[in-house]
Amino acid sequence: EGVTVPVIAEFGPYFDEVSVETPSIEVPGTWLGQMIIDQILPHGYAFAQVSVMGTGRSNHCMDLMGNAEQLGVDAAVTWLGTQEWSNGGVSMIGKSYDGSTPWQAATFGNEYLKTIVPISGLIGVMELMWKNGSSEARAPIMHNGVYGSYGIDGDQEDIGNMCPDYIIGPGTG
């Protein structure tokens, strides 16, 4: 009680999978989760895996690397940095898609985000995925086949997990 710790966070679409369970936490074991549990937590860090919108245990429509997703990542960094158990220092780590979200977060200049460790992440996601405020054709074609599958699982929430721009954007952008 009264102890504060720095936070390491990983943001991405991959966290609706079989989990590793320890006595006090449940974390997806593949990706970086198991390594963080084994190598980082024993040194006094908190660890958060945050599902981007429309994936895992999150809600809202999946806004693949779009403005809403970026604002959500920034809001989550602020939330992590202001918890009573947090010392106010949040770092982000990730590879692949999760390596792009640290770059997204860094663009906001969030006072709680102290460092990023992007591994194989995209820089300039907005330029790649969006054109004139709408998703470009390659956004859903290139990435929804992979990333969209994390938000679409055949249940009634699927319609809510698809942003309207993904339906009309490629045809108009």
Summary of predicted features, one role per range:
Residues 58, 96-97, 120:
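Catalytic nucleophile serine of serine hydrolases
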Residues 84-96:
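Alpha/beta-hydrolase fold nucleophile elbow
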Residues 2-81:
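Cap/lid segment of the alpha/beta-hydrolase catalytic domain
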Residues 7-8, 46-47, 88-91, 112-117:
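Beta-sheet entry/capping signal
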Residues 79, 85, 143-145:
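Signature tryptophan residues that serve as conserved aromatic anchors
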Residues 17, 30-36, 42, 104-173:
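Accessory cap/linker subdomain of secreted extracellular hydrolases
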Residues 94-104:
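Glycine-rich nucleophile elbow surrounding the catalytic serine of serine-hydrolase chemistry
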